[in-house]
Amino acid sequence: AVITDSNSGITQKQAERYGVVVVPMPFLIAGETYFEDVTLTHDAFFARLQEDVDISTSQPSPETVMEIWDKALETSEEIVYIPMSSGLSGSCQTAIMLADDYDGKVQVVNNQRISVTQKQSVLDALTLADRGWSAKQIKEKLEEEKLESSIYIMLDTLKYLKKGGRITPAVAALGTALRLKPVLQIQGEKLDAFTVAKTSKRGISKMLDAMQDDIEKRFGGIENVHMEVAHTCN
């Protein structure tokens, strides 16, 4: 069985089509807990975000993860579990500790992925499983290639970087006053500032330049690259 979490961007409906299981990530909104794409739709989440209510994320409880694993093992001999990057959440390390009690039947992949790159790892795992690879072999292959990806993100506001403690209030205030669009980068386990732009058009241009540089210098040409686009409410 291949299992991931909702940070992959795989919806519950897509999971049924792919034949995988998606662990929903919990959100705490105004003191109440919701589960992504189960008790909280994406549209509803972004609507609440616009209301300026307090929103924080959490990792799935150990009980939830183990319950999903146990159910999967009723029909599968082993599991490949692909959580979000260990550099962005403690959920991966928690899963690694939980897997110690499963005698090798659960292989937790720590390949520093999230969003579209995490989704691609799930699809790659399915392909390898269809070829007869064991869960351990799949884990090793995915981790071997963990640095062979890049994500570039442009945000419309600095507000949530400030709330998450990734930038200081002073920097956020200056950036907001200048109407700057932050461009972030994920390579490996960390989310880092890449550049800023004064307009969305300029931000997109800078991302495209960075992607072109990656394609030519890191990945050896477009024929070696798989690209995806992710967006929210636009």
Predicted regions and their residues:
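N-terminal glycine-rich anion-binding loop in soluble enzyme alpha/beta folds
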Residues: A1-Q59, T64
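Long, low-complexity, intrinsically disordered polar/charged segments
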Residues: A1-V2, L73, M227
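Glycine-rich phosphate- or other oxyanion-binding loops that anchor nucleotides, phosphorylated ligands
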Residues: E51-G87, Q93-T94, K139, K146
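A generic structural signal for short
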Residues: Y34, T57, P83-M84, K159-L161
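Generic signature of intrinsically disordered, low-complexity segments enriched in small/polar residues
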Residues: D37, R48-L49, A72, K105, ...
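A short glycine/small-residue-enriched secondary-structure motif
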Residues: L40-F46, W69, I96-D101
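Mixed-charge interfacial surface used for oligomerization/domain docking
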Residues: N7-V21, P26, E78, G87-Q107, ...
